[in-house]
Amino acid sequence: MVDSGKILEQSFRYAKEGLEGKWDTWMLLIISCIIFPLFLGYMFRVYRGTNSSPPEDSWGGMFSDGIKLFLVALCYALPVLILEVVLFASPGLVKTSPANPGAIMGLIIAVLIVSIILVFGAVLVWLITTTAGVRFARTDNFSEAFNIREIISHISRIGWMDYIVSLLMMLIVLCIITIICLVIPFAGLILLLALLPFMGLFSSRYVSLLYDSGTPQ
């Protein structure tokens, strides 16, 4: 069984120790958040399971790893994006007469069904991509990010319910931090930008530890 509380605590401590007093590292990571492949590349290094935050050197390698990690996410998201375009652009949804109440009701039902399908697909992609990214980092093999059988097997060892609940806990924490920042007038966006490195370190370490819980001892 996954100890989400312990993973949460360890991830906070990891992010705190990785940035506390290291203002040069913090500033470099803030800049890398703007050049997002760099930050993804840094998260890629955290995914490898290091016990301390990795050094922010070899920017070319980080950029390359970040691009590859982005491509993994894009490849998994592409079917959902294509399905969204196909379903919402279908003639039945576009060409509905506003004078026909039955047609309008049918349109509403169709939109609801399509939305449910897309939400389910997006959630499934998120669940798979999360483990796929860590697997890619651990094996250093791009093709392993698409080894669906092993990815599903790994999540099954963690336990699907534990896996989903743990990721939801991480998402809730990140949402709370974001909302607190955004409700602060004027300075909120600046504060959120300043906290992005902490949030990135926290979430990538959290996912890495969650992945470890499904690794055979």
Where on the chain are the PLM-derived regions?
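Alpha-helical membrane-embedding segments
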Residues: 80-97, 169-187
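Short, small/hydrophobic-residue-rich motifs at membrane-helix boundaries and re-entrant hairpins
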Residues: 28-51, 60-61, 65-126
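Interfacial aromatic "cap" segments that immediately flank transmembrane helices
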Residues: 5-31, 56-82, 128-178, 211, ...
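Selective recognition of hydrophobic, aromatic-rich stretches within alpha-helical transmembrane segments
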Residues: 29-48, 106-145, 179-215
